């Protein structure tokens, strides 16, 4: 009994203790909740003077660093899928400019209001590593089927999304983003922004103090959220409380947010405006890097070289005096504390030494006494444009004078770098300049702003010609007439804008190597050259993690082509298509020496016969014969291309009538060349293209017999079947012969490559069998295709020679002019085993060719119809 009483008392005691514990817990919880609320309210009501370096003042609890799921880069190709509003929308163009400047691959499509999105996978691999929406509303308003399809792809292939929201006059003051725990407040005027230093996406961007001042425009969107997946990247304030009554002007708001993927497994970065604000560009580049798993990323290393052209050149009052030279030296030392190995690179024209005022001549002397402090490179002696010199010897004389001046004054002559006045002769290439440079100076490197064109600057590239490395050169807004700060074109604010996040800043941001062109006059008077680069370097170091350094020109060139080896080969263009190019191209040259059409092959299909038939027309003129390749120039497909367009155009006569005369060339190797279509489209983009197709099996056999007749060792050692059926173990000469027999017969593959660069209306496909049996009809079709006049009557001009077995030109007196003895040879018929092998080998290629011809609206040749019947 006592035991039961004791148990009851213990139970009551336990109940009392539990109740007491619960009450204490409630009190403690209430205290901390109230304290947390007060702390949060304190964090939200932040003053405008807050600095981002003090993390305690940041207004979002989500600014605490969270673990982000790593991006799996193995499942996708490194390509961006870009949805734009239209082909010409400004934001879309700005996005493309950054992608192209960064050399990131992208595929642009118009964002569908309704309908399907493009295919996202290919053979089980994702085609895109990142999706960008110019208008994020197009993404959130997609129909459920396509949105689910896209988001499933993003989750499965570890793909992220970047989106922009640009408010307009129709935007509601506030709204919730459909499908997201995210509120948008639109059309706001903002000021004083800073970068969240704890944002995980920061790579290039540094988070310094607040960027004071109003943000451009009054159409900003800010984001508010109540989910741990969101983290602010860029924060700012309202300019005034009147912007929106429900928001406090003392609160910090996010204009760029990062979605860590905790909500639905997809990481995103959203921008509350376009890319007009320079910080948005910087963060956009970092967002691409982070969300692509660093596959689409820019290195932090930046090489800059500042050239000062026209040393000793310039009229009185625009040159450097002693104080200017001392300032140049002092600034160089200052910049060396921020840019490793920084050295100004001085380009001189010795003829103009001591042609200024007395003070300016003293400046010349101080420059020469300080010669070892700088790097030096030769301009032309008299600052003449090299393309005006029509022979190499005259250029050599000018260069020798400048070299003698350099030797007399102790200027180093072994830097291996030169710049031509106005970049004349560098591109378009003036071969005499390259030859003279090598002969007198041993030049290894030059630079130009003209390749392939001056604008847009992001397309500038390098190339190598005649063993001289040509680097892209950048402008910086300083020209010979840019002398005074207050008189800067558009006002001094334009120069400052370029430095502080504008064009000049972006040049360094987006180019791993930048050679800047400045002039002597930029370092006198207001010394805008010094002002520009001191402020530019300070700004870059304040806002980025970029590592700035300088290399001598030759080392810089080697570094450039290590980064961009694909640029070594030039891509020649028609100088007459760019006014700037034509202005710095010799007047002795003419673009009339370029062909209007090309006969591209393939070999052993009847191209020589077509060539001779074309020459019968009074208005059609071919190239002059080559001593090595006879009637074929073979320019676009091989090493001849590196000899330049002057070499190529020398093969063509001057037409008597540039309108009615048609220059052409026939090179049968062009057809299957990987380089020829792109090169031809660059130099002669309006040219028409003619190709001839016969049964690829017959073509392969004919090539084999052709090689036997030319005593090719492999063709003599192996029979035809052994050649076409050999495996990977075969000796190199046999594999080479096999490729030359088989690969040109991949007709659809090669034609598609040409159609990548030329319109279908520029391509004529001739049935080789019809050309052999009925050439007059084919030539009528060719004339119509070319638009050549007058129409030539081939029916009366051609006659069949039964002895030769093909058609010949009928001359006066009944004589004929036929193909040479090497053409139309009689070979033993192909063995059945080889015929069967080739029929199987080309089956898929022939099917693809039939599809291509159907798409082009062209009839199928008889041989192709016969081969397709075998497929069934």
Swiss-Prot record:
GO CC terms in record: Golgi apparatus; Golgi membrane
Pfam families for the chain: HSNSD-CE (PF12062), HSNSD_N (PF25119), Sulfotransfer_1 (PF00685)
Disulfide bonds: 808-818
InterPro entries registered for this protein in UniProt: Heparan_SO4_deacetylase_dom, HSNSD_N, NST/OST, P-loop_NTPase, Sulfotransferase_dom
Alphabetical keyword list: Disulfide bond, Glycoprotein, Golgi apparatus, Hydrolase, Membrane, Multifunctional enzyme, Signal-anchor, Transferase, Transmembrane, Transmembrane helix
Positions on the Cytoplasmic side per record topology: 1-13
Lumenal domain ranges by topology: 35-872
Glycosylation sites: 226, 341, 391, 657, 793
Region (Heparan sulfate N-sulfotransferase 4) residue spans: 589-872
Molecular function terms from GO: deacetylase activity; heparan sulfate N-sulfotransferase activity; N-acetylglucosamine deacetylase activity
Superkingdom of origin organism: Eukaryota
Residues of the active site: 604
Catalytic activity: alpha-D-glucosaminyl-[heparan sulfate](n) + 3'-phosphoadenylyl sulfate = N-sulfo-alpha-D-glucosaminyl-[heparan sulfate](n) + adenosine 3',5'-bisphosphate + 2 H(+)
Transmembrane segments: 14-34
Residues reported to bind 3'-phosphoadenylyl sulfate: 604-608, 702, 823-827
GO biological process, one term: heparin proteoglycan biosynthetic process
Membrane topology, from the record: Single-pass type II membrane protein
Subcellular location(s) of the protein: Golgi apparatus membrane
Additional remarks: The presence of 4 different heparan sulfate N-deacetylase/N-sulfotransferase enzymes in mammals, as well as differences in their enzyme activity suggest that some initiate heparan sulfate modification/sulfation reactions, whereas other later on fill in or extend already modified heparan sulfate sequences.
UniProt record similarity statement: Belongs to the sulfotransferase 1 family. NDST subfamily.
Cited function: Essential bifunctional enzyme that catalyzes both the N-deacetylation and the N-sulfation of glucosamine (GlcNAc) of the glycosaminoglycan in heparan sulfate. Modifies the GlcNAc-GlcA disaccharide repeating sugar backbone to make N-sulfated heparosan, a prerequisite substrate for later modifications in heparin biosynthesis. Has low deacetylase activity but high sulfotransferase activity.
Protein name: Bifunctional heparan sulfate N-deacetylase/N-sulfotransferase 4
Source organism of this protein record: Homo sapiens
Gene designation per UniProt: NDST4
């Amino acid at each position: 009994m006592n035991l039961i009483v004791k148990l009851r008392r213990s139970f009551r005691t336990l109940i009392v203790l539990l109740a007491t514990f619960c009450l204490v817990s409630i009190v403690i919880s209430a205290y901390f909740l109230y304290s947390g609320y007060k702390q949060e309210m304190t964090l939200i009501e932040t003053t405008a003077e807050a600095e981002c370096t003090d993390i305690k003042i940041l207004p979002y609890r989500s600014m605490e660093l969270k673990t982000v799921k790593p991006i799996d880069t193995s499942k996708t190709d490194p390509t961006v899928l870009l949805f734009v509003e239209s082909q010409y929308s400004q934001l879309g163009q700005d996005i493309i400019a950054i992608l192209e400047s960064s050399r990131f691959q992208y595929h642009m499509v118009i964002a569908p209001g309704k309908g399907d999105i493009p295919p996202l996978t290919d053979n089980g691999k994702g085609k895109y590593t990142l999706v960008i929406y110019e208008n994020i509303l197009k993404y959130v308003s997609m129909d459920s089927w396509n949105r689910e399809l896209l988001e499933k792809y993003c989750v499965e292939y570890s793909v992220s999304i970047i989106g922009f929201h640009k408010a307009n006059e129709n935007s509601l003051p506030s709204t919730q983003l459909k499908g997201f725990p995210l509120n948008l407040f639109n059309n706001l005027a903002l000021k004083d922004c800073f970068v969240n230093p704890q944002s995980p996406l920061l790579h290039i961007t540094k988070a310094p103090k607040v960027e004071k001042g109003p943000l451009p425009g009054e159409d900003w969107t800010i984001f508010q959220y109540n989910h741990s997946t969101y983290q602010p990247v860029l924060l700012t304030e309202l300019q005034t409380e009147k912007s929106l009554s429900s928001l406090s002007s003392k609160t910090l708001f996010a204009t760029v947010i990062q979605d860590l993927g905790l909500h639905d497994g997809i990481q995103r970065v959203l921008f509350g405006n376009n890319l007009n604000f320079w910080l948005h560009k910087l963060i956009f580049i970092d967002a691409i890097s982070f969300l692509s798993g660093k596959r689409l990323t820019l290195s932090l290393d930046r090489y800059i070289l500042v050239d000062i052209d026209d040393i000793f050149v310039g009229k009185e009052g625009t040159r450097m005096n002693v104080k200017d030279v001392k300032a140049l030296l002092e600034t160089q030392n200052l910049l060396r504390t921020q840019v490793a190995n920084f050295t100004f690179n001085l380009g001189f024209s010795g003829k103009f030494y001591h042609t200024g005022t007395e003070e300016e001549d003293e400046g010349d002397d101080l420059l020469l006494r300080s010669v070892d402090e700088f790097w030096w490179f030769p301009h032309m002696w008299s600052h003449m444009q090299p393309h005006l010199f029509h022979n190499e010897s005259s250029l050599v004389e000018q260069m020798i004078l400048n070299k003698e001046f350099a030797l007399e004054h102790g200027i180093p002559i072994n830097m291996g770098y030169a710049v031509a006045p106005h970049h004349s002769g560098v591109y378009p290439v003036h071969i005499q300049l390259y030859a003279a440079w090598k002969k007198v100076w041993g030049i290894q490197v030059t630079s130009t702003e003209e390749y392939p064109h001056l604008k847009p600057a992001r397309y500038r590239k390098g190339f190598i010609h005649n063993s001289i490395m040509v680097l892209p050169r950048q402008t910086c807004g300083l020209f010979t007439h840019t002398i005074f700060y207050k008189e800067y074109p558009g006002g001094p604010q334009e120069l400052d804008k370029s430095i502080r996040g504008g064009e000049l800043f972006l040049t360094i941001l987006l180019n791993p190597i930048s050679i800047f062109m400045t002039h002597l006059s930029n370092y006198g008077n207001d010394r805008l050259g010094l002002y520009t680069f001191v402020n530019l370097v300070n700004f870059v170091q304040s806002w980025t993690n970029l590592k700035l350094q300088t290399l001598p020109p030759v080392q810089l060139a080697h570094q450039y082509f290590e980064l961009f080896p694909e640029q070594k080969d030039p891509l020649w263009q028609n100088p007459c298509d760019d006014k700037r190019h034509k202005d710095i191209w010799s007047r002795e040259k003419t673009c009339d020496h370029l062909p209007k059409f090309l006969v591209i092959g393939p070999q052993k299909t009847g191209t020589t016969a077509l060539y001779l038939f074309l020459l019968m027309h009074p208005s059609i003129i071919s190239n002059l014969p080559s001593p090595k390749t006879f009637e074929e120039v073979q320019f676009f497909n091989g090493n001849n291309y590196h000899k330049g367009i002057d070499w190529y155009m020398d093969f063509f006569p001057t037409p008597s009538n540039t309108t009615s005369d048609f220059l052409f060339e026939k090179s049968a190797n062009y057809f299957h060349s990987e380089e020829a279509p792109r090169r031809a489209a660059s130099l002669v983009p309006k040219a028409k293209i003619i190709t001839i197709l016969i049964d690829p099996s017959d073509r392969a056999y004919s090539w084999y017999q052709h090689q036997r007749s030319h005593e090719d060792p492999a063709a003599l050692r192996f029979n035809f079947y052994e050649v076409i059926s050999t495996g990977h173990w075969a000796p190199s000469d046999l594999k080479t012969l096999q490729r030359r027999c088989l690969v040109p017969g991949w007709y659809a593959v090669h034609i598609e490559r040409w159609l990548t660069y030329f319109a279908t209306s520029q391509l004529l496909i001739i049935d080789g069998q019809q050309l052999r049996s009925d050439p007059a009809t084919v030539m009528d079709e060719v004339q119509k295709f070319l638009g050549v006049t007058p129409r030539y009557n081939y029916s009366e001009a051609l006659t069949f020679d039964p002895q030769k077995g093909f058609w010949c030109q009928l001359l006066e007196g009944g004589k004929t002019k036929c193909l040479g003895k090497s053409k139309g040879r009689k070979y033993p018929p192909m063995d059945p085993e080889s015929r069967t092998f080739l029929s199987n080998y080309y089956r898929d290629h022939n099917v693809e060719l039939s599809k291509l011809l159907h798409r082009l609206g062209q009839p199928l040749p008889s041989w192709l119809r016969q081969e397709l019947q075998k497929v069934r």
